[in-house]
């Protein structure tokens, strides 16, 4: 039986947005079980956007969220860090439209979160159970999900030179 987690105490960092180049202060705050991950634009009177598929914005260069015309961009590294270490509930405050890029990976976010530690909450974690394979294709691109006994992710991408397949 797995339970939801938040962080033990607030943590913050500063950086610049990858695409905007704008300075941004990011602060992550613990929150009650069942809240989920919620982004709060403190520069817009605390406007909130839940990290949910229904708020996913169609932006080709980053994982972005949008609600009522308000955008939060480049969320993928922080969201990956949350999933990777098991943070289910947090408020993410930022004072600009884009999260800081830091070193371009999830690692600085992981280190920042591990530094403050996790707090187990008294609510069981709910998980999506995949019962049959699902594939979505668009041209030569595809994504697939398959039933499994445990969480596992494989990812591949093929760029033109000089990067190639990774």
Task: Describe each model-derived feature in a short phrase.
Residues 1-166:
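Short acidic-hydrophobic catalytic motif
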């Amino acid at each position: 039986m797995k339970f939801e987690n938040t962080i033990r105490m607030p943590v913050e960092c500063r950086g610049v947005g990858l695409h905007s180049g704008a300075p941004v202060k990011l602060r992550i705050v613990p929150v009650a079980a069942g809240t989920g991950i919620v982004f709060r634009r403190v520069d817009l009177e605390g406007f909130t956007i839940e990290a949910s598929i229904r708020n996913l914005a169609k932006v080709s260069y980053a994982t972005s969220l949008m609600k009522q015309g308000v955008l939060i961009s480049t969320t993928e590294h922080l969201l990956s860090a949350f999933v990777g270490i098991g943070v289910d509930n947090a408020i993410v405050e930022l004072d600009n439209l884009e999260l800081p890029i830091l070193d371009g990976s999830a690692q600085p976010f992981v280190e920042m979160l591990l530094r403050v530690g996790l707090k187990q909450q008294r609510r069981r974690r709910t998980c999506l159970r995949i019962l049959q394979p699902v594939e979505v294709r668009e041209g030569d691109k595809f994504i697939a999900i398959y039933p499994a006994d445990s969480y596992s992710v494989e990812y591949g991408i093929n760029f033109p030179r000089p990067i190639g397949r990774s």
